[in-house]
Amino acid sequence: MAAPFHTVLIANRGEIACRVIRTCRRLGIRTVAVYSEADADAQHVRLADCAYPIGGPRPQDSYLRGEAILEAARASGAQAIHPGYGFLSENAAFARACAEAGIAFIGPRPQSIEAMGSKAAAKALMEKHGVPLVPGYHGEDQDGAFLAERAQATGFPLMIKAAAGGGGKGMRIVREAREFADALASAQREAQSGFGDARMILERYVEHPRHIEFQVFGDAHGHVIHLNERECSAQRRYQKVLEETPSPFLTPQRRAAMGAAAVAAAKAVDYVGAGTVEFIVGQDGSFFFMEMNTRLQVEHPVTEMTLGLDLVEWQLRVAAGEPLPLAQQDIRARGHAIELRLYAEDPQQGFLPGSGRLERLRLPAPSAQVRVDAGVAEGDTVTIFYDPMIAKLIVHDADRDLALQRMREALATCEVVGPKSNVEFLERLVRHPAVTEGRIDTGYLDRHLDEFLPGDGEDDRAALFAAAVACLLDEEAAAQAQAARNGDPHSPWARADGWRLGHAGKRVIALDGRGGRHTVDAHGHAGRYALASDGIACMVEGARLDGEALSARFDGVGRRWRATRHGNRVAVHDGTRRHGFAHAPAFAFEAGAGDAGDRVVAPMPGRIVLVKAEVGVVVQEGDELLVMEAMKMELTLRAPRGGTVEAVQAAPGEFVEADAVLVRLAEA
């Protein structure tokens, strides 16, 4: 079959740009990338056949500059532009500009984007077509006092949502009327910053709902079908964490009803291309239209894995005027697929986005059952300007239980050194009963977050001894290698066993874990050690380290661990949990906390959007002092203790670096 286009420009970055390039390459299509100053060495730039610079690192200076992207398309001879997701993917003006330039926009018609791009307008349209809606307000009057009245009429709990937004940006849950004004102002700021549109809609908040969406596809010949559902109920801060298909909640009858509603929604706007109709689903099975995303979704790979399709190829062919490759009756799903999003973020700090160089990155080996969609590689930098996703991990197997087990095995091979990551959080997620039993709802993670975090409890003793053995073997191997380079491989000084004249041969391994510092006394050499820590002894025999595979007998019981080391970090994984330690000098003292409680510092680079702190004002612990924007999210910085504001060293609009002191406190 002939390629639908000879040259396609991808107006995006990261993993989605890389993913589109792979399909184009398979079809023999020449690819053109665009990049910001921050992405000059990014993977999508390296993968494309050619690449054009389009501006500064901030999205509004590059990936949101439609004219710069069109200029790159004209210069490169691109026949079509694939927008990916985010950025300009749901921008009707850009889609229209592409058409006027004679360049195909690989997405829906501009009027379809406009109809569904405003949540308020979309809800009005769905209301006309009989699609169930959650009670609320989606009108044009955006006066604050009027919205407060509509909120009171709708009732609490209430959801405030950006009319033109998505992805959790500009969204707040309000449980009491007195919280409404502050929540509205914060959501409006976030929406204005993220989408250039501060309009809000109000909805009655459905308690403990599920989030289930349907993939739809239409062509220019009037055909519209759905490609089954994806359940995305596992969310944190309104961001999807785990997506799967089929949904463990839907019955065949519910699936048929929701699928028909999704197709009706798409037909209502003469939809062409890939889209997703999202529903809120109550615990009783009732469902309500939430929004339609007029683009390819991040989680589309689970649909591809169960159907054996390439949705990007479908997008390309439909954009070229071809009919849909399959009819509704031809859609046959096979097995179960799950996707997880691996992020540079700190779950223990409210999922604070991270940034920095990926000093070490290990991801699962791709196979027929395991897929990895990544936009970065080891040595790349996760920047502060964009979403901190590292990779998407997708698995497929015959049923849900097998798919979950395959995902656990895939996660066990992951390692991220550099910025903090959510890999350990994901490991706990796929073992949690709420997930394995298929009963999670959209608010479960936020309500029970402590169940998914490691906490500050005692370190596992077996893991501590395994980490110590890994350090011992690593030191011995390094000493032997050095001796060989020196031409004396049999020197007793190269044994790294602690032997010295007049010395008993004890080595001390100091490891910092969640439970504090541990010292492990070790006697022995070459895989046979007598270990002791905090009065507990362990005899280790037959220890070997083959690459990252550590095997040994601990007090006669054979164990196998995955052990990795990078710099002073050592991590061991027993197949169920990972345990990380910092290998410290055995007799080093820990630094004290100093005056950390007297300062409020920037947790990461970002822009100050609001300053509430005033010099001389007495504040209480937890009071809101500043709001900053980083990684496209608003972060509220609060007083670490009660006191008097002594100094304010930040102003709205100012860009600050990580660890910059923003507020100083004195005693009240």
Write out the residue ranges for each language-model feature.
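N-terminal beta-alpha lobe that positions the nucleotide/phosphoryl donor
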Residues: M1-V277, V281-H300
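Structured, non-catalytic alpha/beta "coupling" segments that mediate domain-domain communication
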Residues: E90-A97, E339, Q349, D441, ...
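Short, well-ordered beta-strand elements within core beta-sheets of diverse protein domains
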Residues: M171-I173, R204, L250, M389-A398, ...
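Short acidic-glycine loop/turn motifs at beta-strand connectors
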Residues: E176, G218-H223, G282-G285, A365-P366, ...
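Long, charged amphipathic helices and adjacent flexible linkers at domain junctions
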Residues: L326-R334, L449, L453, R578-A602
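Structured functional modules or segments
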Residues: F589-A668
